[in-house]
Amino acid sequence: MDPGNENSATEAAAIIDLDPDFEPQSRPRSCTWPLPRPEIANQPSEPPEVEPDLGEKVHTEGRSEPILLPSRLPEPAGGPQPGILGAVTGPRKGGSRRNAWGNQSYAELISQAIESAPEKRLTLAQIYEWMVRTVPYFKDKGDSNSSAGWKNSIRHNLSLHSKFIKVHNEATGKSSWWMLNPEGGKSGKAPRRRAASMDSSSKLLRGRSKAPKKKPSVLPAPPEGATPTSPVGHFAKWSGSPCSRNREEADMWTTFRPRSSSNASSVSTRLSPLRPESEVLAEEIPASVSSYAGGVPPTLNEGLELLDGLNLTSSHSLLSRSGLSGFSLQHPGVTGPLHTYSSSLFSPAEGPLSAGEGCFSSSQALEALLTSDTPPPPADVLMTQVDPILSQAPTLLLLGGLPSSSKLATGVGLCPKPLEAPGPSSLVPTLSMIAPPPVMASAPIPKALGTPVLTPPTEAASQDRMPQDLDLDMYMENLECDMDNIISDLMDEGEGLDFNFEPDP
């Protein structure tokens, strides 16, 4: 065996024997870590005294033993062994340096650099220069290749710490000054700055955090004895807005928007352009409809109400109202403007009645309708349009279903059952025309007549005589027609109502 190898092995064994912590220790099988030795726990805590020249460790008992310092250890032939040196040096102490240049942080170094300046302010380039000149670790790291890392760390610390403030430099082309915050500032890092447009601004966050606290004061207290009917009962002033907002969102609106009062910008006063459905229904439905039975259709009830206000006036009042279309009705004894009603109840859908579109009527039927307590069936109240060729005749009311014995005073009778034509205006009665009396031979025929305003006949008038404004003798003088021809034409042509009153050759 080589004597050099034997010497190195002996020296290594001697060095390992110096540390008593590596001796075998007995412990129970249940323990995974050796128990503390009682002789180590009983030793005093005074540090040992070591003479640097002799390299001896002096114990409190007075005896000393020579030790080998790490600096005086002979190196083995194979070079230093890391395991042996680590065993000699032992674990690192708790007071070791935090960074490569020492225990000071970047912020502390920057603070020292700024405080060392005469004006207590430095530019970024001056801070770099102070670091390279003062701190030994950065002396050989001033070039551009090796300074990128620590210079970037300095810029981050200047921006993120509130103890440093940036002051504008008045000199042209110079960077800003960095100074210590006179208010002290926090030593820790400030939160990273965000863009002003982001939702995480501190002002909005403070407002959101305070909003729940203001909720009891914003909400109006309900009156005593009142019970809330809906979850949005407290927000009655939101008349135009939907009720889908929850209570918290509504509170946010009332908290952040108290100043806006215009209809364009304020949610609390915005009104819907649509009228409430209850108001529209209240205006469209007449008050008298509710007095009829529920089984009667509303349209028939409206027609009966119109019949209640029929006024039969003289013929001179017809010409003054020639511009009206439809029926102008006014209740007897009631003053005020006349209410104009469309003829959609009684006439087909072609349009309202105009001057010259006529029907036939009898005073008995009118009186029966006006004095009847029960509404007649819809088949008894019918209406039709007559071809415009009859523009010289006034507007007349056709009542179907009358008994065949009821004759008009002038000789015009109504058929019990009207005939149906294929067209929409299909109800045309069979008329038996009788020559008018000679007294009315010279009566002029008006060219255009307005819609008559009908009034009930007076008590003195005869029940069997037609009113003067409805007398057909004054309008139908020398009028000859073949009703068979008319009915056949109506049946053939359908909607095209073409009346021909010329006599056949």
Swiss-Prot record:
The modification Phosphoserine is found at S197, S262. Residues 205-216 have a biased composition (Basic residues). It comes from the Eukaryota. The keyword Nucleus applies. Its main location: cytoplasm. Transcription factor involved in the regulation of the insulin signaling pathway. Binds to insulin-response elements (IREs) and can activate transcription of IGFBP1. Down-regulates expression of HIF1A and suppresses hypoxia-induced transcriptional activation of HIF1A-modulated genes. Also involved in negative regulation of the cell cycle. Involved in increased proteasome activity in embryonic stem cells (ESCs) by activating expression of PSMD11 in ESCs, leading to enhanced assembly of the 26S proteasome, followed by higher proteasome activity. This is Forkhead box protein O4. The lineage of its organism: Eukaryota, Metazoa, Chordata, Craniata, Vertebrata.
